[in-house]
Amino acid sequence: MGPAQKSGTDISIDDEEEILALEKLLGAAENENTKSAESEKAKPTAPILVPKLREDNSFANAFTFEKIVKPEKQKNAAIIKEPELDSSDDEEVKNFLERKYNEYGSDINKRLKQQQENAYESKVAREVDQELKKSIHVVTSTPQPLKNPHNPIKRQSAVSTTFQRPPPVAAAVASTSQSSAPVSAVFTDPVFGLRMINPLVSSSLLQERMTGRKPVPFSGVAYHIERGDLAKDWVIAGALVSKNPVKNTKKGDPYSTWKLSDLRGEVKTISLFLFKEAHKSLWKTAEGLCLAVLNPTIFERRAGSSDVACLSIDSSQKVMILGQSKDLGTCRATKKNGDKCTSVVNLTDCDYCIFHVKQEYGKMSRRSELQSATAGRGINELRNKVLGKNEVFYGGQTFTAVPARKSAKLITKERDRLSMLAGYDVSPFAHTANHTSKPKTAEPTKIPYAERGGPVSRLAGGVEASRKQRVQDLERLRLLKEENERFEKKKQAEGHVLGSDNKKESEAGTPAVSMPTTPVPDKFKNRGFSFDASLTPKLSGSENFSFEINVGSRQAQNAKLKAAALLKKKPLEKINPNSTRGSESGKRRAIDELNEKFSSSAKRQKIDEDDRELMRKSRIEKIMAATSSHTNLVEMREREAQEEYFNKLERKEAMEEKMLTTYKMPCKAVICQVCKYTAFSASDRCKEQKHPLKVVDAEKRFFQCKDCGNRTTTVFKLPKQSCKNCKGSRWQRTAMIREKKILTGRETLSVRGDEETFMGCLAGSANLNLLVPDEE
């Protein structure tokens, strides 16, 4: 080392010593200033005594992770993430002129180092994933909690395994048989009784932190605020039901408002205000989490608020997050305006709030018309049943519609139309006075079609033949006559024999046309039918025309020709004298052979039929015993239907249980300032006279008469009216619905009916129980 280098190092050492000495002097001066300022502050005025509740930071040990451990880890991570410099980088930084690589070479060197680091990190990540998979297969653990800044995933390591329990055998078998979604286990904390999934604090740790502190339930918050010892530590816990939007104070500081509830019985809520550091730390907390609050400050409850109490905190150390609530939910019913109901319910008890549970219970019942409030079909249906079809009830009066009358012209038109559609003709006896037939002795004269008279059917009479149509008909008749004459001449020219035969037959057939008129039976008189033979439809032309062909002679001639042709081909053979064919013995022998043949064939046929019957029966049995290859799907569908049926019954029973445990419910009441009464609705007189009305929040209570069991509702502590049934005043609290009881018959049997103590008295169910004892 040369002298120049030694002198440089000595100079640098002297400069560093001077800098350290200056820093010590400045630090001593600052310490003196701070001590003097504290002494000046301690001198003036006496201390002001402000009542303040004691804060214990040990309650929130679960959250010291974010304030102490987390910053230290972040610092260590920042130190670790600083780039490590090797010898070449150090030389480049210290000796810029003597660097090893140029810009291009240093860039390549950095990329190579990054690739090496990435390869190492991927290898480590792969090994960690393999270890995690092995641990997941070995140990069954609850899923990770919700991600939010106040219960990070890293805190899972601090939670003990006391909440974790092995699943039952049935659940394990079901999980292996069916690939369904994993169901999170439900846990109940031993102090507050809240049901949770994914708990963040173990039961032992919670009991340890609650030593010396009093858990206050929601039902006793009001009493504890008014008469309890607030100097001692007390804790209230519940589920975060809702969060109102962030607001600002008069000074401009933001604050949050939460609603907490324990979801038991009648769902009660409290308001929790978060100020200052509590708002800054917890404003992102998700809804549905179970919280425990230590020693909150008490606010005065706002008038008209439905909350049990109003509390506030200003430090996040007073809040402990227990886990995700299992029971929190909203009502599944729909309001009258079509919007979804937003009331908070306990899903374990029932899916509907107290305002809609009775309505849904009626819908779910099979005979919903009997479960309705009116227990009937309604006044409109009753009115429609009593009144007729032509009666209308309007404005307190009954109006009857006048039936429509048909005119005489319309009646005749309809009668003619019906008779025309039926095809009735005018009776041939309609021209006589008494509609009787006149005997026809003379032969009917042959007149042309156009000149015929007499009765004509209505269908034919309805159509008026024009002159042109008549001319065409006459021309057709003339042509037919000429054709007939020409045919007769041709037939006479063919042969006298055939012509003479035809002539005789035509002469014999001529009088057959003029047959006597068939007598009309008495039962067919005065009918629109025609029984006259002359009115039967015939072809126009000569009535004496007939045409016959002798077919038999031609067939005989053809048979003779065929026989002669056969004899020419092969002459007749001589008869065998020894042949018995055709004799009596031959016939008997043939008959015996046929009988044997048919009897054997019948036996064989019977055997075949029996075999076929057996085969058919066996086939039918196989068909009936055959099963589908998809029987497992059928069984699965049956199980699903059965499960759906029982789930419906369970929901119905849950609704019934909720109504049986509901003795009052919030409602709106009307106060008339003139008549001085409070009721569910205003009377008609107040509405007509427009009295000033005031609508207030009230509670609807249910009562039952001890004497007759009649039920009533009121907005007061007790009903102010007597029983409408028995005129008694002995009331007792009851549930929203009447409890169903199984009667054995002894409770309702009364041989002589309901007894009356005096005239006009109706003792609802007076029972004498006049039963005959059983004979031994």
From Swiss-Prot:
Keyword Secreted recorded: no
Pfam families in UniProt: Mcm10 (PF09332), MCM10_OB (PF22379), zf-CCCH_Mcm10 (PF24863), zf-primase (PF09329)
GO cellular component: nuclear replication fork; nucleus
Principal localisation: nucleus
Region (Disordered): 30-49, 430-468, 487-521
Keywords for the protein's UniProt record, in alphabetical order: DNA replication, Metal-binding, Nucleus, Phosphoprotein, Zinc, Zinc-finger
Classification via InterPro entries: Mcm10, MCM10_OB, NA-bd_OB-fold, Rep_factor_Mcm10_C, Znf_Mcm10/DnaG, Znf_Mcm10_C
Domain notes per entry: The zinc finger-like domain binds a zinc ion and is involved in self-association.
Protein name as it appears in the record: Protein MCM10 homolog
Gene from which the chain derives: Mcm10
